């Protein structure tokens, strides 16, 4: 007899800094855009206070992962340097790691230089790369 619940029938998990995340049920990822030109919420979350307020709200509403993006992927968005992307991310990552040390952090970037900084300096748990590592 086959199980009725076949969509999540396999057992998957992620090991994030030694914490095993069970993916047998869906997880909520809160999106934090720290760009001034995001098509969704551009410019709303650029200060430490704004970042922490939004992060706390998303966690309270059920997010178990916070995905931080500092480069807008909207059509026609400004092309920024890796250094500018890193600068934007550092403000958010400093604040989140300090005030929410146990939250799972994902960084949305397609640049290896930015991903390396995020992993080395902030021990981010996930790199969310729209290019699957093929951009550079």
Where are these regions (language model features)?
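N-terminal amphipathic alpha-helix/helix-capping segment at the start of soluble metabolic enzymes
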Residues: 1-33
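Short, well-ordered coil/turn segments that N-cap beta-strands
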Residues: 24-28, 63-64, 101-103, 123-125
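Conserved, mostly hydrophobic/aromatic
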Residues: 32, 58, 62, 108, ...
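Active-site mouth loops of central-metabolism enzymes
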Residues: 34-53, 78-79, 105-106
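Glycine-rich, proline-tolerant flexible connector loops at the mouths of alpha/beta enzymes
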Residues: 38-40, 65-91
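Alpha-helix-loop-beta-strand connector modules within alpha/beta enzyme cores
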Residues: 78-107, 112-117
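Catalytic beta/alpha-barrel core
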Residues: 102-110, 125-136
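Glycine-enriched alpha-helix->loop->beta-strand junction motifs that scaffold or abut catalytic
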Residues: 116-126
């Amino acid at each position: 007899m086959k199980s009725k619940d076949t969509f999540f029938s396999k057992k998957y998990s992620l090991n994030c800094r030694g914490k095993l995340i069970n993916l047998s049920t869906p997880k909520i990822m809160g999106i934090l855009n720290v760009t001034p030109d995001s098509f969704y919420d551009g410019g709303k979350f650029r200060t430490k206070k704004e970042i922490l307020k939004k992060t706390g709200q998303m966690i309270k509403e059920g997010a178990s992962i916070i995905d931080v993006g500092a480069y807008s992927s909207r059509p026609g968005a400004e092309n920024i340097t890796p250094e500018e992307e890193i600068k934007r991310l550092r403000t958010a990552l400093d604040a989140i790691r300090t005030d929410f040390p146990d939250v799972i952090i994902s960084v949305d970037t397609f640049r290896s230089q930015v991903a390396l900084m995020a992993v080395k300096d902030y021990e981010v748990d996930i790199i969310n790369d729209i290019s699957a590592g093929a951009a550079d």
